């Protein structure tokens, strides 16, 4: 279930970013309330295969693009300890 949720989240980020719809923070909550997390922009662009994102952030890419944007996931996922903001 977590893997499916993560894939769905990444898909939403990629599609939203390609359409310019991602704001600074995107909140997501599962239907049963078990998962509650935010996707936060790290305010940095990135390149595939490089280590350009700040610590704790990942590079979100659209399709086969080599350029993307850095994001961080903050919050609770089922069965995992809470992620703490730094």
UniProtKB/Swiss-Prot annotation:
Segment forming the signal sequence: 1-20
GO cellular component: extracellular region
GO term, biological process aspect, one: negative regulation of protein homodimerization activity
Sugar-modified residues: 45, 76
Upper lineage: Eukaryota, Metazoa, Ecdysozoa, Arthropoda, Chelicerata
Protein name: Evasin-3
Disulphide bridges, residue numbers: 42-57, 46-59, 53-70
Molecular functions (GO terms): C-X-C chemokine binding
Main location: secreted
Keywords assigned: Disulfide bond, Glycoprotein, Secreted, Signal
């Amino acid at each position: 279930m977590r893997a499916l949720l993560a894939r769905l989240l990444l898909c939403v980020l990629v599609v939203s970013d390609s359409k310019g719809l991602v704001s600074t923070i995107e909140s997501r909550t599962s239907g049963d309330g078990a998962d509650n997390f935010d996707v936060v922009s790290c305010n940095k662009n990135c390149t595939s295969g490089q280590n350009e994102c700040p610590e704790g952030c990942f590079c979100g890419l659209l399709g086969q693009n080599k350029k993307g944007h850095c994001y961080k996931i903050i919050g609770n996922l089922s069965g995992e300890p809470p992620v703490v903001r730094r």
